[in-house]
């Protein structure tokens, strides 16, 4: 029984409860310096990901609103570009850019 309790405690400690991502967390990255790995280490996996080759966008849902982190492809890999709220205007911009670059329909999850 003690072994079972110890195993559960270890799992809770190592797996832990993830902290809630805040807008402040998303705004704390350095432009053209922070990498995708930096972002994933700090705030975890995004709710959605859009990969168009030249750019990648991660979406995080915070308090019922979506915020996106934009990455641009550089010779050194993808680098953080900016954080913004996902508005209809920005979603339409992403749709147009994605469809032009990939010649594929905009993913339903992003519409």
What are these regions (language model features)?
Residues 18-111:
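Residues within mature, well-folded domains
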Residues 1-4:
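Positively charged n-region of N-terminal signal peptides that target proteins for export
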Residues 13-16:
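C-terminal motif of bacterial Sec signal peptides marking the signal peptidase cleavage site
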